[in-house]
């Protein structure tokens, strides 16, 4: 007889998050608006996220995918200030574990995010290369949580890259 495996919470949530990534990739592009909303909601819950937004830095627009709709007045112009973009890692990921650290390092980002109550964020350059793409997806939290796990950052980058490419491609065709 087989032995029942006792997964601890950490292992369970890691595999649960992988399933969310897989589901996004399998379903998002062909899904209707209601299903897309459900998929985005699943991402937010699994990763303890309060806001998800795509910044189109070419058009200086922000598209809220999840969270507070009043945040649309932020156009992402803060990305051009404080020499912010070079802080992204080579893989296109940038992590804010505590927004207070940026009060002097990147005051424009600090001002925008603190006004909305965002204290932690993971940002990803859609496509992974700032030289080829001006679009960024940002995931924000309103409460300080533990530091972002490396696996979570990578999962969010994969999700953000896929959703971002689909979203922006569809906007260009509208």
Task: Show which residues each predicted segment covers.
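Signal-transmission linkers at sensory-effector interfaces
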Residues: 1-34, 172-174
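Amphipathic alpha-helical coiled-coil segments that mediate homodimerization
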Residues: 20-47, 54, 159
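GAF sensory/regulatory domain recognition
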Residues: 41-44, 53-77, 85
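Long, hydrophobic, amphipathic alpha-helical segments used as structural scaffolds
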Residues: 51, 58, 167-171
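Regulatory sensory and allosteric helical modules in signal-transduction proteins
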Residues: 73-122
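A short, hydrophobic, proline-anchored segment that marks a local hinge/packing element in signaling
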Residues: 120-132
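Short beta-strand-to-loop transition segments that serve as allosteric relay/switch motifs
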Residues: 135-147
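Amphipathic alpha-helical "output/dimerization" segments
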Residues: 147-168
